[in-house]
Amino acid sequence: METETATTPTGNTEPTAAASAEPPKSDKVTVRLRNIADAPVLKNKKMVVNPTDTVASFILKLRKLLNIQANNSLFLYIDNTFAPSPDTTFETLSRCYSVKITDKEILELQYSITPAYG
């Protein structure tokens, strides 16, 4: 593999930004879900979402998968501790809270239909 270089004004050659940049991260975020208390259990506990998706849009998708009506509550938690803000993107959540499992980063979330923490 050939490294891209550029010549500086002093005549030296240096690697370009493209050559020294980190490899791009995956364009999706892997989410592992776990139910808390009396919340329905999902058949598929792993989901892949776009990093630009918000928590609010994810909760809407999760409501459909769990057949939870709009008049019933659905709570989402990180680290069994706190609920992320609905306008937070999965890129931000992944960057701050993902755990590395077998060379993959996974965002672990818990969901409940009754308040569980805080």
UniProtKB/Swiss-Prot annotation:
Function: Ubiquitin-like protein involved in autophagy vesicles formation. Conjugation with atg-5 through a ubiquitin-like conjugating system involving also atg-7 as an E1-like activating enzyme and atg-10 as an E2-like conjugating enzyme, is essential for its function. Most likely a component of an atg-5-lgg-3-atg-16 complex that promotes autophagosome formation by associating with lgg-2, but not lgg-1, at the preautophagosomal membrane. Probably, as part of an atg-5-lgg-3-atg-16 complex, required for lgg-1 lipidation; the complex acts as an E3-like enzyme promoting atg-3-mediated lgg-1 lipidation.
Gene Ontology cellular component terms for the protein in this record: Atg12-Atg5-Atg16 complex; autophagosome membrane; cytoplasm; cytosol; phagophore assembly site membrane; transferase complex
Annotated positions for site Required for interaction with lgg-2: D87
Family matches, as CDD domains: Ubl_ATG12
Domain remark in the UniProt entry: The LIR motif (LC3-interacting region) is required for its interaction with lgg-2.
Annotated keywords: Autophagy, Isopeptide bond, Membrane, Ubl conjugation pathway
Protein source organism: Caenorhabditis elegans
Family statement drawn from the similarity comment of this UniProt entry: Belongs to the ATG12 family.
Chain intervals with Low complexity compositional bias: 1-23
Protein name: Ubiquitin-like protein atg-12
A GO BP annotation: determination of adult lifespan
Cross-link Glycyl lysine isopeptide (Gly-Lys) (interchain with K-129 in atg-5), sequence positions: G118
GO terms, molecular function: protein tag activity
